[in-house]
Amino acid sequence: MTNIRKSHPLIKIINHSFIDLPTPSNISSWWNFSSLLGICLILQILTGLFLAMHYTPDTTTAFSSVAHICRDVNYGWMIRYLHANGASMFFICLFIHVGRGLYYGSHTFLETWNIGIILLLTLMATAFMGYVLPWGQMSFWGATVITNLLSAIPYIGTNLVEWIWGGFSVDKATLTRFFAFHFILPFIILALAITHLLFLHETGSNNPSGIPSNTDKIPFHPYYTIKDILGALLLIMVLLTLVLFSPDILGDPDNYIPANPLSTPPHIKPEWYFLFAYAILRSIPNKLGGVLALTFSILILLLIPSLHTSKQRSMMFRPLSQCMFWLLVADLLTLTWIGGQPVEHPFIIIGQLASILYFSLILVLMPLAGIIENSLLKW
């Protein structure tokens, strides 16, 4: 008799994806973040579901309903902070996951990479809409500023913004639709993540050396399940430390003030994980130019497969490209810092230089490093 996990139509799919999956024997801990992203997504859906049971998407009661969750609902404060800080952990894992793909040349799996970028964009949209829901000062003004950017689109801009708002300003209609989208998008993300996995299993996983590993594969279970459980425990430990000791460290104190359309906060800024893109947006004095730079700062990832000039896939044996990669990481950290600073000297010029360097590295310096390395190896 055949084992049920190999014969049952549904369990068979799970078996081929997580149990008997042939996996390269040399993949490092940088590959752990894919499973951590799955854990983060499930955690966000579950905590979000419990929050939605008590939340009211109405401008008059939204702020009070969040306060009610924290004060009166059993462990409501914990669910709320798990959800808020879970988003931060999600983005940390996501940035590392994308960085790992870039470093080890995983972008040569075109379909997997492109669906990954779509996932990134959907996730950013979901997080932005979630930030609006508590209806604090930063929620309201963040929503106003970011949605207003669409007015830079020639001819249809103003109509588009009013259509998104559902009126002439961010109001009840905006909050209701943002809640609806924030609720449905995680399930779309889940479907996209399954598609992402499906395309990955068509080609098989990449590995640090970047060369085919068909001759040296091991089953995913028990080797990598144990490794993933260790990563998951560390993630949960860090998340619980954040939630139980300093839940507001990554948030903005202005969001504890109820939204007031008549009073603008001194510094409007998004959550920390959007600050790099926000810094690029602010570094261009022209509104349309800033919006284009902001959009292109994420969409540029779609060009990376066609900008790959090296004859080696991974950066493991390419010291020049490694320097460029870590320079890019340092540049993104600089942009994140600048995004949280006020618009004044010297932050303006630092932001502009960091933005120029960001695009130069991806479009010019990294492809150039690949060409130089090829010539050094006489290829």
UniProtKB/Swiss-Prot annotation:
Cofactor annotation comment: Binds 2 heme b groups non-covalently.
Transmembrane helix listed as a keyword: yes
Subcellular location: Mitochondrion inner membrane
Pfam families documented for this protein: Cytochrom_B_C, Cytochrome_B
Top-level lineage group: Eukaryota
Residues at which a ubiquinone binds: H201
GO MF annotations in UniProt: metal ion binding; ubiquinol-cytochrome-c reductase activity
Swiss-Prot/TrEMBL keywords: Electron transport, Heme, Iron, Membrane, Metal-binding, Mitochondrion, Mitochondrion inner membrane, Respiratory chain, Transmembrane, Transmembrane helix, Transport, Ubiquinone
Annotated heme b b562 binding sites: H83, H182
Residues the record lists as binding heme b b566: H97, H196
GO cellular component, one term: respiratory chain complex III
One GO process term, biological-process aspect: mitochondrial electron transport, ubiquinol to cytochrome c
Cofactor(s) needed by this chain: heme b
Nucleus listed as a keyword: no
Oligomeric and partner information: The cytochrome bc1 complex contains 11 subunits: 3 respiratory subunits (MT-CYB, CYC1 and UQCRFS1), 2 core proteins (UQCRC1 and UQCRC2) and 6 low-molecular weight proteins (UQCRH/QCR6, UQCRB/QCR7, UQCRQ/QCR8, UQCR10/QCR9, UQCR11/QCR10 and a cleavage product of UQCRFS1). This cytochrome bc1 complex then forms a dimer.
Other remarks in the entry: Heme 1 (or BL or b562) is low-potential and absorbs at about 562 nm, and heme 2 (or BH or b566) is high-potential and absorbs at about 566 nm.
Primary role: Component of the ubiquinol-cytochrome c reductase complex (complex III or cytochrome b-c1 complex) that is part of the mitochondrial respiratory chain. The b-c1 complex mediates electron transfer from ubiquinol to cytochrome c. Contributes to the generation of a proton gradient across the mitochondrial membrane that is then used for ATP synthesis.
Stated name of the protein: Cytochrome b
Native species: Rhinoceros sondaicus (Javan rhinoceros)
